[in-house]
Swiss-Prot record:
Species whose genome carries this gene: Pseudomonas aeruginosa (strain ATCC 15692 / DSM 22644 / CIP 104116 / JCM 14847 / LMG 12228 / 1C / PRS 101 / PAO1)
Protein name listed in UniProt: FMN-dependent NADH:quinone oxidoreductase 2
Named cofactor requirement(s): FMN
Subunit structure: Homodimer.
Keyword Transport found: no
Any further remark recorded for this protein: Rate of quinone reduction is higher than reduction of azo substrates, suggesting the enzyme is better suited for carrying out quinone rather than azo reduction.
Amino acid sequence: MKLLHIDSSILGDASASRQLSAELVQAWRQNEDGLDVTYRDLAADAVAHFSALTLAAGSTPAELRDAALKHEVAVGEEVLEEFLAADVVVIGAPMYNFTISSQLKAWIDRIAVAGKTFRYTENGPVGLAGDKKVVIVSTAGGVHAGQPTGAAHEGYLRTVLGFFGITDIEVVRAEGLAYGEEPRTQAIAAARRQIAGQFAAA
């Protein structure tokens, strides 16, 4: 089994999403012999945002691409191939200003590729990546799950993953992390129980 582990927090070792996503992946390793893990840190090694250069790279014949266009194509292909190869994707997704980090959005823009993760038909879009399981490690300073303020965070991720055809989506959630030390401790403990319960039921 191949697992793709994505982190997107800018907080380094102080990040709850990084801590919990690492614990989730470690638990998976302990319960899945031969697990092949690919790790991508979108804060430390950011994927360039979708731009005019991206469009130019895709529309320019390979033999006519300069160094910048070749690099743009290589980055997009590498990110997409990692995603397509994975059986499981673990996404560390902290909330910043009511949505996901710009680094995570840049990654999503690179895997949203017509003919690879979705296609359009006369009856509408069809997802092409539905054979995956995705676990979103969702963290937030406030409490937003199930509310309008969370629509551009967990809601957005569910929407775009669903657009890719993915229906097996789970959320490990720790929110209210900015409400004080005790609420933070309780929220992280609850997320850890979710992680433990996921494998206890397996």
